[in-house]
Amino acid sequence: MGLLGCGRGGATTTPPATAARGRELLVLGGTGFIGPHLVRHAVARGHRVTIFTRGRREAALPAGVTRLIGDRDGKLEALQGRRFDAVIDDSASKPERVRLSTQLLKDQVGRYLFTSSTGVYYPYLQPGADERRAVRMAATDPEDGSEAYGVAKAQCEREVMQAFGARGTVVRPTYIIGPGDTTDRFPYWPQRLARGGEVLAPGRRTDPVQWIDVRDLAEFMVRLIEDDRAGTYNVVGPRRAWTMGEFLPAANAAVGGTGSFTWIDDYEFLSAQEIFDSVPWVMLKDNDLWHMSSSNTKAVAAGLGFRGLEETVRDTLAWWGTVEAARRDRPGFSIQPEQEARALAAWKALRA
């Protein structure tokens, strides 16, 4: 498959057509990772957007966007009495915050779209998780952060559906990647591949990987609002199943990388080197065994589209070059240069 085979090529070259009817949209958030892409696309589609934030972070947003200042922890006065066609909540992972916003807005807005996560399916003990799968509503292990996150998101979903019923919509994205990433997870690969040399390739070539470009997520969320769709949707890409053995060469070609790959498929060895993940790759064992197998069938039928990996990788690399030098010098990558060098040396010594 070619580099653009996992989706539509050149998705950002044509401006989006405007919606048949512009809507009044409220975005809870709007200045993080998803928010700016969401706001830009909504405005380009002809919608009028208001964002509600704490006012602590700046973002390049289109002219005409209304900004309200407040806090999800009870300081919602700026929202009182305001009416919107829909609200998009992309800033909550605590159910008590969602309860406050849904109770305040349930008689002021038409539809409430909540940004959840495929993390609600944790532990990933069965393949092919779709939206009908039961999710945990209570944690069983206080030391398991992944479980706590998934349970919290599931409880947030419940708050939305209890307050809005058929006017509630939930999206469950997998790992979100692309320009503007606030996590420093995926940017590792574009910059590392562009640097060249011997590249540690973690895991088995056959390990499945999933991701969603933040712009594809944002466009789908706006589409759900425009189509007035209820229900829950796994927002997972690419369109078909991909493996790490396909992802790395394709990403490497996208940046014109000249390096070579040294595959380390021994999970025990990687664990000893404290290499457990490098998005979109995660170590597929134990509670993460089927982490990368969520179904996207329902979302695709509802209009979810996918831009090619080449575009995502190139745009992420270009954006990474614009972030502040202090962050680039001390990134929060899951594989650090010294760590990679030590692991490669130890792997070669083990196999000598």
Segments the model singles out, each with a brief description of its role:
Residues 184-189, 202-227, 231-234, 311:
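Substrate-positioning beta->alpha
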Residues 1-14:
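N-terminal export signals
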Residues 48-54:
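Conserved glycine-rich Rossmann-like NAD(P)H-binding loop of the short-chain dehydrogenase/reductase
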Residues 156-180:
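Conserved beta-loop-beta element that borders a ligand/cofactor-binding pocket
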Residues 223-290, 295-297, 314-317, 324-351:
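Mid/C-terminal beta-alpha module of Rossmann-like enzyme folds, strongest
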Residues 24-45:
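N-terminal Rossmann NAD(P)H-binding glycine-rich loop of SDR-like oxidoreductase domains
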Residues 25, 31, 56-109, 114, ...:
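NAD(P)H-binding glycine-rich loop region in Rossmannoid oxidoreductase-like domains
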Residues 100-154, 161-162, 169:
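Conserved Rossmann-fold NAD(P)-dependent oxidoreductase catalytic core, especially the SDR/UDP-sugar
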